[in-house]
Amino acid sequence: MVLVGCHVSIAGSIDRAVGRALDAGCDTFQIFSRNPRGWKVKDLDPGLAGAFRAAVSASGIGPVVDHMPYLPNPASPDAEIYEKSVAALAGELRRCSLLGIPYLVTHLGHHRGAGMEAGQERVVAAINRAFEDAGESDVMLLLENTAGEKNSVGTTVDNLSRIVDGIDAKERVGICFDTCHAFAAGYDLRTAEGVDAVLGEIDDAIDLSRLRVVHLNDCKGDLGSGLDRHEHIGLGRIGEDGFRHILRHPAVRRLPLICETPVDERRSDTGNIAKVRELAGA
């Protein structure tokens, strides 16, 4: 049995996301807790937060995963963007606490030509400040690996390890592993040996106990292309055999699996969830 779900909309009211997750056949699901394309955010209404928590509890599905909005860039050398990014991260941690969401996934941003080391140092400082500003919390911040786009931070396991090492409250940080991003960054997930290799590297450098969520996406780009273009499960360059190897690895089978696959006529979210269960042998 695997826990698999997808990203669902909060349109209309955040508690409606739970019904959408149930309709899609989710065992677990991911949301943006607010508009992901803007900086401004309204305070979370306590009544709505309570309704969301009640709906999740009644549904029997979970854990719920929240994803940071698109604009924050905690690696940015631009002072204004950086400060807004720290504030956004602290604010989202507080929102997760109110909503009872245990995991917040964040991208690590782009260093804008300042260099990987400088970018990593900014990310570490941003996370340390955000944790302090947000206050004590059971919410775990999950660092997501990136696809290897120009100037991106967090592409390699070594990048992620160096960031984790610099964080003061290490018990509050984990990893979200995105299969599309890993493949685009050069990690070959098409074979059992390739899957074993990258998970072994994570275990050696970071510890598999920090791996808490998998973003399960096929990849439109070739191995090492740096192309962050998600594809339906089994229809991209990783392929069905690759996902069989991924899904049958014991370190993956125990985790919440979130599909962030395209919205088009070829396959629905429900179809991707069914395909994951098929390939997992569940």
Swiss-Prot record:
Residues involved in Zn(2+) 1 binding: H67, H107, E144
Cofactor(s) needed by this chain: Zn(2+)
Molecular function GO terms recorded: deoxyribonuclease IV (phage-T4-induced) activity; DNA binding; DNA-(apurinic or apyrimidinic site) endonuclease activity; phosphoric diester hydrolase activity; zinc ion binding
EC number: 3.1.21.2
Gene Ontology BP term (one): base-excision repair
The protein's name: Probable endonuclease 4
Keyword Lyase: no
InterPro entries referenced in this protein's UniProt entry, alphabetically: AP_endonuc_2, AP_endonuc_F2_Zn_BS, Xyl_isomerase-like_sf, Xyl_isomerase-like_TIM-brl
Function comment: Endonuclease IV plays a role in DNA repair. It cleaves phosphodiester bonds at apurinic or apyrimidinic (AP) sites, generating a 3'-hydroxyl group and a 5'-terminal sugar phosphate.
Organism field: Methanoculleus marisnigri (strain ATCC 35101 / DSM 1498 / JR1)
CDD domains for this protein: AP2Ec
Keywords: DNA damage, DNA repair, Endonuclease, Hydrolase, Metal-binding, Nuclease, Zinc
Keyword Disulfide bond tagged: no
Family: Belongs to the AP endonuclease 2 family.
Residues noted as binding Zn(2+) 3 in the record, renumbered to the chain: H181, D228, H230
Gene symbol of the encoding locus: nfo
Catalytic activity: Endonucleolytic cleavage to 5'-phosphooligonucleotide end-products
UniProt-listed Gene3D superfamilies: Divalent-metal-dependent TIM barrel enzymes
Binding site for Zn(2+) 2: E144, D178, H215, E260
Entries under PANTHER family matching the protein: APURINIC-APYRIMIDINIC ENDONUCLEASE, ENDONUCLEASE IV ENDODEOXYRIBONUCLEASE IV
